[in-house]
Every structure is written in C-alpha cells, then in structure tokens.
C-alpha cells in the first residue's frame, strides 16, 4: 500500500515542473508521484545490493560531537519529530531512478513509522536529494536545509536506504563504541585521509537499544571498504563474519528494531 502522503500529491506530472515559490533558489525540484510508487512495485527484488563504495558518506556537524547524547541515532532533539522527514527531490532523476527512490521511501513507510513526505511551506527542516558528488548524507536532523547526495552511481535500493538511515540519525555499525570486541580496523590499508571514517564515535553518547553488534546491518561497511591497496580494512574477530559484512541488500531485523525503538514506532512489533 502506498504511503498516505502520496495521495495528496498534485495530479499532474512533477518530474519537470518548476519548483513552487517556497522551494529554495527556484531550481528544478519535484516530489515523487503516485506513478513513481506504482513503478516501484514493478522493480525486481533481486540484485539490490549496493555497488558503490560508501566510505566518507556521513557528515556530522562539529557541534554534534560536543553535545553528545543519542541513540546510535542522534540525540532526542536531533531526531525528526514523529518520524516525519520532509523532502524535495531534484528533477534530474529519470523515471527509473525515481522508482528506486520510491521503493526505498515505501519500505520505510511499511516497516517503520518513518515517513518521507513532500516539503510544505511550513517545513523549516528538510532534506534536499540531488545528484552531487557521490553518495552521502548529513547525520540526523541538523536544522534547515540539509543535503543528501545520490549521484547516478548511488541509485540502488541498498545504498539509498543506507543513506536515509544517516538522515534519521544512524551511524555505521563499525563505528560503535563496542566495535573492538567484534572487528579489527586495519588502518594501514585505509585510503589516505579516510581514517576518520573508521574511527569509533565514542563521544556521541550513543545507545543501541539493547541490540548487539550486527554484521548483517545495512549500516556495515564491506571488509575492503575504503582500501588503498585492495586489502581488507575491516576484519571480523570471528573470521566467518568477514565475508558477511557489508553484503546486506536490505534492512536486517536488528536495523528495524533499532529504528522502531528509537522513534517509538508503537504500531510495529519490536
């Protein structure tokens, strides 16, 4: 079933429409349409694994480190109220790409209480999804306009739901404070300048809602993510899990429990 917000969209196609007067910079932006959500239902459910490297894909404002608090997700004040995330979407995406985006939005709506909804004139905090320079997103609700970059190489279902997890406040699994009990980081193999993407985020005061470290999380890097020489940058303490890390094509059960607990999604069992 389509998210409730879809039914209130304009009946005319929006992919190439001029932005309403309240959209920033009068650029070409749009929203997903009912057609996009119908097309999403026609997409194959196989071969959805991400194909693009994701190191350096999360941006955390400096003040967030000083404030602390959070949930492996952000502090309460940095969450999106009632799980509602207003968005505007670049009109540069093709109909096929919009269908993949719609599938990601619809999955959040069906399996959590997170709703990505068209930005209204009253919404001051919102995300802008554009084709910029790779795949990345601002961490949690930062206030005002915030960026989600999904370039052409990022338009696969797994990458999109991963980046949207950053938007609602979730960090990478290998950056948990307790990660040293589960994985080893091989900094000697990490691309120069990317060490911070492998550091623990121990000063954010994160909580994990009772969920153990999850090698199958959609938020986990692959073993050779961000490698400068093709060798592993992350290895599981139990070598069996090294081949599993970063191979997720969808949310893990633990991912969904964390989202639903963090946002108090009472209609979902968690």
UniProtKB/Swiss-Prot annotation:
Subcellular location as annotated: Secreted
Residues annotated for Zn(2+) binding in this entry: 162, 166, 172
Disulfide-bonded cysteines: 113-265, 135-154
Top-level division of the source organism's lineage: Eukaryota
Gene3D superfamilies assigned: Collagenase (Catalytic Domain) (3.40.390.10)
A GO term from the CC aspect: extracellular region
Residues at the active site: 163
Keywords linked to the UniProt accession: Disulfide bond, Hydrolase, Metal-binding, Metalloprotease, Protease, Secreted, Signal, Zinc, Zymogen
Cited InterPro entries: Astacin-like_dom, MetalloPept_cat_dom_sf, Peptidase_M12A, Peptidase_Metallo
GO BP annotations listed: proteolysis
GO molecular function ontology, one term from the record: zinc ion binding
This enzyme's EC code(s): 3.4.24.-
Signal peptide: 1-17
Cofactor binding description: Binds 1 zinc ion per subunit.
SMART domains attached to this UniProt entry: ZnMc
Chief location bin: secreted
Cofactors: Zn(2+)
Residue intervals of the Peptidase M12A domain: 71-266
Role noted for this protein: Metalloprotease.
PANTHER family cross-referenced by the UniProt entry: DISCOIDIN, CUB, EGF, LAMININ , AND ZINC METALLOPROTEASE DOMAIN CONTAINING (PTHR10127), ZINC METALLOPROTEINASE NAS-1 (PTHR10127:SF798)
Name the UniProt record assigns to this protein: Zinc metalloproteinase nas-1
